[in-house]
Amino acid sequence: MAQVQYYGTGRRKHSVARVRLIPGEGKIVVNGRDLDEYFGLETLKLIVKQPLVETGVTGQYDVHVNVNGGGFTGQAGAIRHGIARALLQVDPDNRATLKAAGFLTRDARMKERKKYGLKAARRAPQFSKR
């Protein structure tokens, strides 16, 4: 018999996360590695787990994630977004909870481009009066 799986795609900065929720005991696997092994910082682990904690389903689903692009912070945000979207498939009643917490909103903030004549996006070259 086929096992029930719920899918969600999350994005943040330049990171894209493809998330699968499978009924299980709460293991989170990111790119074939355990969550604790993949993310060193505790804050990033908390960010990833937020939607599960908010909806009260911690320990009920195994989470399998493929994430690529961006850095660790962007990847953690993308995973959070993907898990939230997958939890909507699990139970549409979760929408109000997830929406209020802001987990369903794609964070549109991106790195500002560097402009010519400047050293960075807004950093101007040092000014010399004389």
From Swiss-Prot:
Stored SUPFAM superfamilies: Ribosomal protein S5 domain 2-like
GO molecular function: RNA binding; structural constituent of ribosome
Keywords: Ribonucleoprotein, Ribosomal protein
Pfam families: Ribosomal_S9
Disulfide bonds: none
GO BP term, example: translation
Any one cellular-component term (Gene Ontology): cytosolic small ribosomal subunit
InterPro entries per UniProt: Ribosomal_Su5_D2-typ_SF, Ribosomal_uS9, Ribosomal_uS9_bac/plastid, Ribosomal_uS9_CS, Ribsml_uS5_D2-typ_fold_subgr
Family label: Belongs to the universal ribosomal protein uS9 family.
Protein name: Small ribosomal subunit protein uS9
